[in-house]
Swiss-Prot record:
This is Serine protease 58. It catalyses: Preferential cleavage: Arg-|-Xaa, Lys-|-Xaa. The active site is at 56 (charge relay system), 101 (charge relay system), 195 (charge relay system). Disulfide bonds join 41-57, 133-201, 165-180, 191-215. Its EC number is 3.4.21.4. The keyword Ribonucleoprotein does not apply.
Length: 241
């Protein structure tokens, strides 16, 4: 229940809008759609048996769907729907904070890797400010969050400095294990998108979205879990599970 309450706070709806200029016709092959009985999340395939997402996506009856572009289209040809064995969130994650908002999902069976389903590369070095990143997730263009999102979109935005991020989010504690990506001041138009969008920078998965006041697909500043910081934890979980 606490996870659902946090999720509701992260997904308060205003008017909904989307930008067709950002719509893409095919899914980044690492991108995973996590469907639940509440609201969906994005995830990233990092191993044939493991998906990484935000810890606030620990939601009821989660279903892992790979190779999907439009979730509402049941006729897509390259879907893989896989059950999960367990969800492991970071031990320091708390529902009262956006810090350590990261979780691993172990699949029941290995994903079949092909042209439409591939692994994302994990980073083994950090990145500097002004690095350009590609952020992808699904967007709603109707005022009904209980329907499936209508379009998959990608936007290219850059990493900003910690001082800029702290200025954008004065009431949040921006720690060294967070990454901020977007344009300041942002909040240019209302929107609604699927949470936990990944940030791919220089071909590496550098961030998983924890929170944004607005929408990252509109280049509003998002606060991401910095994946590089969590590499030891990720490797340990996969090795021991």
């Amino acid at each position: 229940m606490k996870f659902i309450l946090l999720w509701a706070l992260l997904n308060l709806t205003v008017a909904l809008a989307f930008n067709p200029d950002y719509t893409v016709s095919s899914t980044p092959p690492y991108l995973v759609y996590l469907k639940s009985d509440y609201l969906p999340c994005a995830g990233v395939l990092i191993h044939p048996l493991w998906v990484i997402t935000a810890a606030h996506c620990n939601l009821p009856k989660l279903r892992v769907i790979l190779g999907v572009t439009i979730p509402a289209d049941s006729n897509e040809k390259h879907l893989q729907v896989i059950g999960y064995e367990k969800m492991i969130h970071h031990p320091h994650f708390s529902v009262t904070s956006i810090d350590h908002d990261i979780m691993l999902i172990k699949l029941k069976t290995e994903a079949e890797l092909n042209d439409y389903v591939k692994l994302a590369n994990l980073p083994y070095q950090t990145i500097s400010e002004n690095t350009m990143c590609s952020v992808s997730t699904w967007s709603y263009n109707v005022c009904d969050i209980y329907k499936e999102p209508d379009s998959l979109q990608t936007v290219n935005i850059s990493v900003i400095s910690k001082p800029q991020c702290r200025d954008a989010y004065k009431t949040y504690n921006i720690t060294e294990n967070m990454l901020c990506v977007g344009i300041v001041p942002g909040r240019r138009q209302p929107c609604k998108e699927v949470s936990a969008a990944p940030a791919i920078c220089n071909g590496m998965l550098q961030g998983i979205l924890s929170f944004a006041d607005g929408c990252v697909l509109r280049a509003d500043v998002g606060i991401y879990a910095k994946i590089f910081y969590y590499i030891p934890w990720i490797e340990n979980v996969i090795q021991n599970n």
